[in-house]
Amino acid sequence: MNLLIIGLPGAGKGTQAAKIVEEFGVAHISTGDMFRAAMANQTEMGRLAKSYIDKGELVPDEVTNGIVKERLAEDDIAEKGFLLDGYPRTIEQAHALDATLEELGLRLDGVINIKVDPSCLVERLSGRIINRKTGETFHKVFNPPVDYKEEDYYQREDDKPETVKRRLDVNMAQGEPILEHYRKLGLVTDIEGNQEITDVFADVEKALLELK
């Protein structure tokens, strides 16, 4: 089974990806892991990626696409299938993935889209606070400290609501064309992500069993 998992930051995509890998035995291919492995193994694309990263530059799409292609060509993919997590990030990468899969004789079986209302995600992502003395991390709503005093805690710039909202807006603008592309191919299953983790996975599992 060859899959993509898609979701906005905070939607719980990583948690569900780990559960899919555990339950269905597919190879988990995340962008970060791919880059680290390619650079550690000094593959052609890994060396290219490192040259950009060392200069503090963004890795261009053709290198990222090349690293994905190297990984999808490995033997375990044909045996186990894959779950791509964090790629494609743009419609151009989605088209490149289509071409790579065709070249390698692989087929995408499904796209799992973990849907959560953006306003809920702002609450999830902007609630993180850090204790000034201990460095411990809490959440205002989901994991509040016992003796909360506002002056004892601070919030990182990245976690402030306006910053979180901007980040989500960028992700939605990039993600919509990708979802539309896969919807036209009849591959997308929408999963309601604003429920208990076990309930989300029950819906994911049901969808994937129907694909088998």
From Swiss-Prot:
Q: In which pathway does it act?
A: Purine metabolism; AMP biosynthesis via salvage pathway; AMP from ADP: step 1/1
Keywords, A to Z? Answer: ATP-binding, Cytoplasm, Kinase, Nucleotide biosynthesis, Nucleotide-binding, Transferase
Q: Where is this region: LID?
A: 127-159
Q: Which GO terms describe its cellular component?
A: cytoplasm
Segments of this protein annotated with the region NMP: 30-59
- Per UniProt, ATP binds at G10, A11, G12, K13, G14, T15, R128, T137, F138, Q195
| A single GO molecular function term of this UniProt record | ATP binding
Q: What is its EC number?
A: 2.7.4.3
Q: Where in the cell is it found?
A: Cytoplasm
The protein's matches in PROSITE patterns, at most eight in alphabetical order, are given as: ADENYLATE_KINASE
Asked if the keyword Ribosomal protein belongs to this entry, the reply reads no
Q: Which reaction does it catalyse?
A: AMP + ATP = 2 ADP
Superkingdom to which the source organism belongs: Bacteria
Q: Which residues bind AMP?
A: T31, R36, E57, L58, V59, G86, Y87, P88, R89, Q93, R156, R167
Entry text on domains: Consists of three domains, a large central CORE domain and two small peripheral domains, NMPbind and LID, which undergo movements during catalysis. The LID domain closes over the site of phosphoryl transfer upon ATP binding. Assembling and dissambling the active center during each catalytic cycle provides an effective means to prevent ATP hydrolysis.
Q: What the protein does?
A: Catalyzes the reversible transfer of the terminal phosphate group between ATP and AMP. Plays an important role in cellular energy homeostasis and in adenine nucleotide metabolism.
Homology family: Belongs to the adenylate kinase family.
Subunit (UniProt)? Monomer.
Protein's name in the database: Adenylate kinase
